[in-house]
Curated annotation (Swiss-Prot):
Gene from which the chain derives: tig
UniProt-recorded Gene Ontology molecular function terms: peptidyl-prolyl cis-trans isomerase activity; protein folding chaperone; ribosome binding
Source organism (scientific name): Anaeromyxobacter sp. (strain Fw109-5)
PANTHER family reported in the protein's UniProt record: TRIGGER FACTOR CHAPERONE AND PEPTIDYL-PROLYL CIS/TRANS ISOMERASE, TRIGGER FACTOR-LIKE PROTEIN TIG, CHLOROPLASTIC
SUPFAM superfamilies with a match to the protein in the record: FKBP-like, Triger factor/SurA peptide-binding domain-like, Trigger factor ribosome-binding domain
Domain notes: Consists of 3 domains; the N-terminus binds the ribosome, the middle domain has PPIase activity, while the C-terminus has intrinsic chaperone activity on its own.
Taxonomic classification: Bacteria, Pseudomonadati, Myxococcota, Myxococcia, Myxococcales
Record keywords: Cell cycle, Cell division, Chaperone, Cytoplasm, Isomerase, Rotamase
Protein known as: Trigger factor
Gene3D superfamilies, A to Z: 3.10.50.40, Trigger factor ribosome-binding domain, Trigger factor, C-terminal domain
Catalytic EC class: isomerase
Domain of life: Bacteria
Length: 430
């Protein structure tokens, strides 16, 4: 096999590969032998059909499979021989395919990690903001807790729905005059607010009195979870049965107990726990801001190109994170009218910074010969378990897989590189 590597750019290589005719012939022979054992042809016992007969019927299929197999195998071999630090799958172009007595020739364009010789990363000058927790921050957290423990109670002395009420309804729907599954229900609670009834909102009830019925058309989106309803419009009859409102619990010891925080029985104890948690959070935030500042300062002294594939992957990860946050709030991001192209464009700068920072920290770790020990991994697992409030054994179990362990190892190595930058930096109070 002949391999030629051309540097297209600091982050791209063009790999030209020529595969010997003998290897091609051997793979063809193996492919036809395997095919002969599998297929049944009239007039031949299993495994006895001559290759020429097989070629007449299956040549294109066999040659396609052999070409794919040889390209996969030889490209992997070339990557190993040339020590190419790939960051994405190759773009392959075959110039000469499978032919009797001839070599296979193809090229693969690949993105690779840039070669970085880090410099001037010691003595960086950054500022550190002192973490601060105010009484207002504690009160805000208590208010959020209070809101999360609110309950729906009947509205007293009023019989007309207002915005932000919670309405108990019976509804009956039809599509093209026919009932549909899920169209009829009783005792359903919806919010009197803008939005779709399928999302738990019904603004049309505003101003309606108990016992009144409203009629409306409800369009279902093209990506509705029920396939039969996608793109259809339902005619709904909705009857208002009861009105409820959210009632906040009092800020007292009973709320502190209801919060379910271990060891907390009084409001004063809850305030103290919230303050302690906020102090930890603000300390972590201050440390994170210093780390971000150190990375930005180091990047300012080290210019290098970044593989586009890594940036796109970082954007994908950011979008997945956004989708997960929406999902935790009960919102399907696919049903929102979002401009994903604009979102990707808006995320690009942050994604580029993330990728550049990770590549530089990896290069610094290489330059400083930073190693990660089993003790380091155990300590990180213990830290994660404490932060999540999860059993250490459970965290360790999740990290036993090869990919999870490698990801953890990379994070610990990156953290060690950051610690080195911090210890060698000139950090002044903000």
């Amino acid at each position: 096999m002949k391999i030629q590597v051309e540097n297209v750019s600091p982050v791209e290589r063009k790999v030209s590969i020529e595969v010997d005719p003998d290897r091609v012939a051997q793979e063809l022979e193996r492919a036809y032998a395997g095919l002969g054992r599998r297929v049944k042809l009239r007039g031949f016992r299993p495994g006895k059909a001559p290759r020429k007969v097989l070629e007449r019927q299956f040549r294109a299929e066999v040659e396609s499979e052999v070409l794919e197999k040889i390209v996969q195998q030889t490209f992997a071999e070339a990557v190993k021989v040339e020590s190419l630090p790939l960051v994405a799958p190759p773009h392959v172009s075959v110039s000469e395919g499978v032919a009797d007595g001839k070599p296979i020739r193809y090229t693969a364009r690949v993105e690779v990690k840039p070669a970085i010789a880090p410099k001037d990363y010691r003595g960086l000058e950054v500022t550190r903001k002192a973490p601060e927790v105010t009484d207002q921050m504690v009160s805000d957290e208590l208010s959020r807790l209070q809101d999360s423990l609110a309950q729906l109670v009947p509205v007293e002395g009023r019989f007309e729905a207002q915005e932000d009420d919670w309405a108990v309804i019976d509804h009956e729907g039809t599509i093209d005059g026919k009932p549909f599954e899920g169209g009829k229900a009783e005792g359903v609670t919806v919010k009197v607010a803008p939005g779709a009834i399928s999302d738990g909102n019904l603004e049309a009830l505003k101003g309606k009195k108990l016992g009144e019925t409203v009629e409306l058309d409800e369009p279902f989106p093209e990506d509705h979870r029920v396939e039969q309803l996608r793109g259809k419009t339902a005619h709904m009859k909705v009857t208002l049965k009861a009105l409820k409102t959210r009632q906040l619990p009092a800020l007292d010891d009973a709320l502190a107990k209801e919060a379910g925080v271990e060891g907390i029985e009084t409001l004063d104890a809850l305030r103290a726990r919230i303050r302690a948690d906020l102090e930890k959070r603000e300390k972590r935030r201050a440390e994170s801001e210093v780390k971000d500042a150190l990375v930005k300062a180091a990047l300012a002294k080290n210019e290098f190109e970044v593989p586009p594939a890594l940036v796109e992957r970082a954007i994908d990860s950011m979008l997945e994170g956004a989708a997960e946050r929406f999902a935790r709030s009960g919102i399907d991001i696919r049903r929102l009218e979002l401009d994903f192209a604009k979102m990707r464009a808006d995320m690009r700068e942050q994604a580029l910074l993330q990728v550049r920072g990770a590549l530089l920290l990896e290069a610094i770790a290489d330059a400083e010969k930073i190693e990660v020990t089993d003790e380091d991994l155990q300590a990180e697992a213990a830290r994660i378990a404490e932060e999540l409030g999860a059993p250490l054994a459970k965290v360790q179990q999740q990290m036993r897989g090869k990919d999870a362990r490698e990801a953890l190892k990379n994070k610990v190595r990156e953290d060690k590189a950051l610690a080195l930058l911090s210890s060698a930096a000139n950090i002044q109070p903000a």
